[in-house]
Every structure is written in structure tokens, then in C-alpha cells.
Amino acid sequence: MPSPLILCRYLPRELSPTVDSRSCSSPLVASRAGKFLGATPPRAPRLSRRLAWCFIDWGQVCLLHRLGSGGFGSVYKATYHGVPVAIKQVNKCTRTLRASQRNFWAELNIARLHHDNIIRVVAASTRTPEGSNSLGTIIMEFGGNVTLHQVIYGATRSPEPLSCREQLSLGKCLKYSLDIVNGLLFLHSQSILHLDLKPANILISEKDVCKISDFGCSQKLQDLRCRPSLHHIGGTYTHQAPELLKGEIATPKADIYSFGITLWQMTTREVPYSGEPQYVQYAVVAYNLRPHWQAVFTASLTGKTLQNNVQSCWEARALQRPGAELLQKDLKAFRGALG
């Protein structure tokens, strides 16, 4: 059995798993459920209620099926103490061990935080069942089977296919946008940057609420300020702000840029770019390349209002983009004007 990290590593003050360069956002690929990692779970120690999330009561874990797998491990649907949850197992891969460790600790940047539009961490531990090839396990609330990406592009694992036209009316688009911005506003108020915001990382619950998930690229602002060398950020190139592509230090405005691309996707139901990633990245920085404006943005007054919102979010200079609070105010006013 691997030795656990010392307890002080779990304390809130020590939960500072910032990262520099790493590969992130490997899309989850659906696969058949397999046997859970081992048969002999470690015994959970007695902890105060404040620290209860730091360890997993393995006897209360019941795996249902695998939801998918990616570069850093697998995600399962399960129950924990009888409640539906998602369990992320981070692989112990020698080739990418350091990146996997960073991903694991970055996911815990949101530990002990609670917000309706943020996936909640229920429990986490570096102690894993004997014989497993995992460096850590994270139990999260189950946010739903469907992502915003699946709603936009019509692909879903749900038994009943979604109708994009029904699911993404203007009203629905604004509702989802406000959910996402509310989540960002909360994260930024806690000095946390997501840094990989995109439709595939937005879960939609059974109550039709958007929840921001996948914090494997997240960073804390104070760590970026204390250690400026941590400025080379992982993420998804189509949604990365120009300043990040240039290797500059991340700010909350980087998440706003990513939201602008996401809002464009919700409105057009198109993919942002075509072409080789390196050419797209160069053009975004050197030539201010952005996704093409579609007719939906110019055909009506509401379309033009949406265009203005998107345009403000993906401005080349971070200082020219609105903060989450102002963006929330504008979207609420827009939604209210529609009645």
C-alpha cells in the first residue's frame, strides 16, 4: 500500500497545487466499466468533521459503471454513502507522473468550496486500494450525464437523443450563460482561475443547471503572484486567451475570454476553428484571429446584443474584457429585456 501524504498537506492553507506546463483536457472517451482498482481498501482514520473530506471511507464506495477515461485516468459513476457521485481515479503513469500529480492537486483547488454552479469535491485521498495503479482518488458530486458540448453539437450518451433546437433557444442560451458566469464570479471571488473553461467541461444536471467541472488546469491567484514562473498554462488551445498563448501570467480575464468562445459556440453551434493547432495559435496572437461571425449575430437586434457580449469577452487585451461581475450584470439585463 502506498504511504499517504502527511496530513498537513491536506489542510486548506497547504492546498496550493499550482502547476506550470502540463497537458490538460484529454476528452473523456466512453468505455466499458471495469473492475475497481483493488480488493483491499485502506482503513479510513477518524477525523474531525472539518477534515472529513481528506479521506475516503472505502467501505461506502459502490461503483456503478465507467463514465469515461482520459490522459490522467478514469471517471466512474458510483454511490458514496448511498448518494450518487462521480469518482476520478488519477493514474500513476511513470511517463507523465509529474503532470498527473499536478492534475490531482489542481482538482483540489476547489475542495471545501460550495456553489450551485461548481462541481463539489466530496472526498479525496492519496490512499488507494492495495494493488491499484492510482496516485489518488477524488469523489465529486454527480453533476449529470450530459455536457454542454453534447447539447450544442447533439451528441449524448443519454438513451433519448437531445434536440439542439429545443435545448438551445435564446432563452436557454442566456440561462446557461448566467449559470456559467455565476460560477466564474464565485471562483474569482475565491482567487481561483479555472483556465480550461469550454463546453466539454460544463456539466448539465437533471435540474437543468450548468456546473463547471474539471479543475485539473486550475490555479490560485496568490500562487501565480508569489511564483511568476508558473505562467505557462495548460488548457485547450481553441479557448485559450492570447496572453496565455504568449506565455504571460494568467488573470481572471483569461476565463472571461474562454467564456466568450463558449458563448459563440452556444449561439452558432459551430466549432471555433479549423486547421492545425499551431497555425491557429499563431494567428490568434499575431493577427487577432477569432471565430467567424455568423448570420445569427447580425439578423436581429438580439443577435447584435449577443455579438457585443461575445466581442467584449474575447478582446485581445485582457484589461479591455469585462470582469465576471459586470458580465453577470449585462447578461441579467439582456435576459430581463427579453421578458
Curated annotation (Swiss-Prot):
ATP binds at L67, G68, S69, G70, G71, F72, G73, S74, V75, K88. Gene3D superfamilies: Phosphorylase Kinase, domain 1, Transferase(Phosphotransferase) domain 1. One of its GO terms (biological process) is regulation of meiotic nuclear division. Expressed mainly in gonadal tissues, and cardiac and skeletal muscles. Residues 61-335 form the Protein kinase domain. Signal peptide: none annotated. It is an enzyme of class 2 (transferase). GO terms for molecular function: ATP binding; MAP kinase kinase kinase activity; MRF binding; protein kinase activity; protein serine kinase activity; protein serine/threonine kinase activity. It catalyses: L-seryl-[protein] + ATP = O-phospho-L-seryl-[protein] + ADP + H(+); L-threonyl-[protein] + ATP = O-phospho-L-threonyl-[protein] + ADP + H(+). InterPro entries: Kinase-like_dom_sf, Prot_kinase_dom, Protein_kinase_ATP_BS, Ser/Thr_kinase_AS, Ser/Thr_Kinases-Pseudokinases. Its main location: cytoplasm. It comes from the Eukaryota. PANTHER family: SERINE/THREONINE-PROTEIN KINASE TNNI3K-RELATED (PTHR44329), V-MOS MOLONEY MURINE SARCOMA VIRAL ONCO HOMOLOG (PTHR44329:SF285). Serine/threonine kinase involved in the regulation of MAPK signaling. Is an activator of the ERK1/2 signaling cascade playing an essential role in the stimulation of oocyte maturation. This is Proto-oncogene serine/threonine-protein kinase mos. It comes from Rattus norvegicus.
